[in-house]
Amino acid sequence: MNGNPISSTAISVQMAYQYYIENKFIVNRKYQRKLVWTMEEKAAFIDSLQKFYSVPLFLFANKNIEGVTSFEIIDGMQRLNAIMAFIENEYPIKTSDGEYRYFDLETLSSTKSAMDNGEIIQRTPKLERQLCVNITNYPLPFSFISADEKSIEDIFRRINSYGRQLSNQEIRQAGAIGLFPELVRKVSCIIRGDVSPHDQLKLNEMKLISLSNKRLNYGIVMEDIYWVQQHIITIPNMRVSRDEELIAWILSYMIMGEQVSPTSYTLNKLYKYSISDDENLSTKIEAQIEHLGSTTIQQWFSSIHSFIIDILD
């Protein structure tokens, strides 16, 4: 390898699915956003595979967890989920005859076994077997990197900053270290209802805490989230983490008062914590959070939020 920390190869969809059911794909919630693709976006990606169109690179960080090799997803989480969800019959794709058809579970031995065991139910009408074979044989461009956590988070930020795939708030929050970003994450999760016991999750666990809608039988139904119910934030804006941006503004004002203003420029400063600059706004808010206590501030926010809900109800 000549010291090169990056390796690239083509992995078939079938092999990628095998990695998936072996829980080799890991998601780090410190920088990864939620699963936000709609059924239409997922189906469009599967259609690209069916037509053998070129697709973007999937990027992973090599990890060794308790002696087991796994791959932390840096870029490609939404696409990977689209593949796995389609294979497991969570949604159909539209075919040339105008019908919406589901993956034939008998195409792969692993899905056939899961169907026989009652773990997956075959939905109908089924997609033609040969088309399913074509999809599972598609060579996905996988790239693996060996790097420390700080470098991985930096790579994620750069990919999504230059590609404009994430919103400003998602980029701010991606891998941000400090009491303030962590407080925003925790409070946002509590309000949405997607709290998880730890930051690293298996890819197949992500759908349980991801933003969904009434057509999908899993996740957090966005229509039921406080911000959407009260017409404060629209569903499209929930998908790009505007709720976290709003909570960041509220928390910063609760903690710092009139020292902060509700602007993107201020939020950018709050998320760039630097212990070497005592005059830095992010340093000041970190010191104030440490003084007041993250748990105390979280309780303040939750109490006020509960009071508002009681009034509205």
Predicted regions and their residues:
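Acidic, carboxylate-rich catalytic segments that either coordinate divalent cations
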Residues: 1-17, 301-312
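C-terminal subdomains that position terminal phosphate/3'-OH groups for nucleotidyl transfer/ligation
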Residues: 242-313
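Conserved aromatic/hydrophobic "specificity hotspots" at molecular recognition or selectivity sites
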Residues: 20
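Basic- and aromatic-enriched surface patches that contact anionic nucleotides/nucleic acids
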Residues: 2-7, 11, 32-38, 43-256
